[in-house]
A protein has these predicted regions:
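Glyoxalase I/VOC metalloenzyme domain signal
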Residues: 1-43, 54-160
């Protein structure tokens, strides 16, 4: 049984999304996000079980880089690309972080992105649309693009 969002309430606690991922290359990852991309950061947060989170600000969003003292294995995620809007960027410029994630700086407003954009792969576009709009309450912008507050989600077909 699913609970659908009435549209009156948002599934977000703030007007944007955060994104997080695990890394096995924390020193290289921190250098990438702090030095190469220049994102401001906070002191790391330690959790039970040997988990540590490094938080980097991206407007109102937070990039959460997580590490573990234990083997975390590898499991695929649906994130395909992270977009960062930048007033000083004239055309999209892609790079890859130390974990192989594609990170693209885009001009502010490119694809409707004002801060954070996330490209997501889904095996079923209609199911993903239903989940984002009817369950999460995100705004359908057409062409498989959704607004989660001021975060833009771009969904593409994944036939794997």
């Amino acid at each position: 049984m699913s609970k659908e969002n009435s549209g009156e309430e948002r599934a977000l606690s703030k007007n944007c999304m955060d994104i997080g991922f695990f890394t096995r290359h924390i020193d290289k990852a921190l250098e990438f996000w702090r030095e190469e991309l220049g994102l401001p950061f906070e002191e790391p947060v330690k959790f039970n079980g040997g988990l540590t989170q490094y938080r980097h600000a991206l407007g109102d969003s937070v990039i959460k880089i997580n590490t573990s003292d234990r083997d975390i294995g590898s499991s695929p995620c649906g994130y395909q690309e992270l977009y960062i809007a930048d007033d000083n960027t004239e055309a999209p410029v892609s790079t890859t972080d130390p974990d192989g994630n594609i990170v693209t700086r885009v001009p502010t407003g490119h694809l409707g992105i004002q801060g954070l954009g996330i490209k997501v792969a889904s095996p079923n576009l209609e199911t993903q649309r239903h989940f984002y709009t009817n369950v999460m309450g995100f705004k359908d912008l057409g062409s498989h693009k959704f607004a989660a507050g001021n975060t833009i989600l771009l969904v593409e077909q994944n036939n794997k």
